[in-house]
């Protein structure tokens, strides 16, 4: 995300009138004067985007996706939108006027969708401000750095107005990881150093050849595929890929964290959208030794079945199916809704990095190790690790694999994916594969934070 502020905050006084149709900019300024003042002083920026039909249209859906990373509010509309935005200070509020919209029951339901646990939104007020204009007043718990943008229709979605509310100071994933559970981290370090292991520690498996003897904690980033606006594949019984991938990833994280020499970090820990580039960026910020993206496969024929493992390819895909899958997964940003107005220089560098041969070789090694374990709990769709140009696997210095746990489009495997026992078996199998890989390929020291000595 860009470090440049989208607009400055000015204190224009409280918007405290109870009726939203009476809420207006402070009486000292008319709308035209306020806009002139903004242009002259550069202390207020009002952004207008998009186009609107002359007649009022209908908001077809409103959705709120809270998370500690950011909160997203989405309004789905039948036509393109024209909107105005304004930040107000003391107390902090975000005001959004939407033109050409009727205040219907869908918009009336928006305030009720705000959770008390939302990290950034205290409440939302919505109502008609003047003919053909609906005003949203979002009362905030703290200062934010908003990103507001529109998305064109794709898939089952119509036009969308997206309000992303980020903290004014971006969350550092490394510090968040360390603060998540300081006590458990200290206990893991003590166990790795050979001090008083907990009674609850259980070995991942008793197979020979996977004993780990390393000098520091191994950091593994787990990436539950999809999330938020992007449900991923949907099974015939209505199972969302984003739901099962998060559940499996959480189980795997718990098992990894129970190891004396490993720790896991999730790219998302709840139901919200994370752009592909940010998933990779999170892994690099915590000096990850391994990146694992968890998915559930799908195909037009319900008979397709089995588990698969994929790695990045510098050249072409290893099969037509692998190329098709990579194209499908890489489209996640379009469905989930990424703000193309904010450029990610890290992602640009990553996509241009062509010196990934060594990392890809390591990815193939860990992929082969994990695939061998998956074959013990499920049919393998392909007996070898496949390769294609997955954007989420393009960290140039982190071995990265994408696991298709099963086919959610297959009714039998969809049932497996929602079964707690199968999810647990899947997590165990992946962990065994990880341990086997690191037993043969101990990680090098990357940071003082990771070291045990």
Predicted regions span which residues?
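Short, solvent-exposed loop/turn elements at domain surfaces
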Residues: 84-85, 105-106, 229-233, 411
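Residues at or immediately flanking beta-strands
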Residues: 145, 263, 308, 382-384
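Active-site-adjacent mobile loop/cap segments within catalytic or ligand-binding domains
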Residues: 290, 300, 351-453
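Catalytic-core regions of hydrolytic enzymes
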Residues: 189-345, 356-368, 424, 443, ...
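Flexible glycine-/small-residue-rich
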Residues: 77-79, 98-100, 140-142, 165-167, ...
């Amino acid at each position: 995300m860009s470090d440049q502020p989208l607009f400055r905050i000015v204190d224009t006084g409280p918007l405290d009138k109870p009726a939203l149709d009476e809420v207006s900019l402070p009486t000292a300024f008319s709308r035209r004067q306020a806009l002139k003042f903004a242009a002259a002083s550069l202390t207020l920026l009002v952004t207008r985007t998009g186009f609107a039909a002359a007649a009022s249209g209908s908001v077809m859906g409103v959705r709120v996706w809270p998370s500690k990373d950011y909160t997203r509010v989405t309004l789905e509309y039948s036509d393109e939108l024209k909107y105005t935005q304004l930040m107000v200070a003391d107390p902090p509020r975000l005001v959004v006027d939407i033109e050409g919209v009727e205040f219907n029951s869908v918009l009336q339901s928006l305030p009720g969708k705000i959770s008390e646990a939302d990290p950034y939104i205290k409440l939302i007020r919505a109502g008609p401000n003047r003919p053909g204009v609906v005003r949203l007043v979002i009362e905030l718990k703290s200062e934010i750095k908003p990103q507001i943008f529109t998305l064109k229709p794709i898939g089952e979605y119509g036009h969308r107005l997206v309000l992303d509310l980020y903290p004014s100071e971006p969350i550092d994933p490394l510090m968040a990881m360390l603060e998540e559970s300081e006590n458990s981290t200290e206990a893991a370090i003590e166990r790795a150093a050979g001090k008083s292991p907990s009674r609850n520690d259980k070995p991942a498996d008793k197979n020979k050849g996977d004993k780990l003897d390393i000098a520091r904690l191994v950091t593994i980033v787990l990436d539950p595929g999809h999330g938020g606006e992007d449900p991923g594949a949907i099974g015939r019984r209505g199972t969302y890929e984003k739901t099962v991938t998060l559940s499996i990833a959480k189980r795997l994280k718990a098992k990894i964290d129970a190891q004396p020499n490993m720790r896991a970090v999730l790219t998302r820990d709840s139901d919200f959208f994370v752009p592909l580039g940010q998933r990779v960026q999170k892994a690099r910020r915590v000096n990850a030794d391994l990146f694992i993206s968890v998915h559930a496969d799908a195909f037009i024929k319900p008979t397709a079945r089995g588990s698969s493992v994929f790695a990045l390819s510098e050249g072409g895909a290893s099969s037509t199916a692998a190329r098709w899958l990579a194209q499908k997964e890489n489209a996640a940003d379009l469905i989930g809704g990424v703000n193309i107005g904010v450029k990610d220089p890290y992602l640009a560098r990553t996509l241009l990095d062509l010196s990934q041969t060594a990392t890809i070789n390591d990815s193939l090694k860990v992929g082969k190790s994990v695939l061998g374990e998956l074959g013990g709990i499920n049919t393998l769709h392909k007996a070898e690790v496949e390769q294609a140009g997955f954007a989420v696997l393009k960290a140039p210095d982190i071995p990265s694999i994408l696991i298709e746990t099963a086919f959610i489009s297959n009714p039998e495997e969809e049932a497996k994916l929602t079964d707690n026992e199968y999810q647990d078996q899947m997590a165990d199998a992946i962990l065994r594969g990880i341990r086997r890989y690191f037993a043969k390929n101990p990680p090098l020291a990357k940071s003082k934070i990771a070291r045990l000595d």
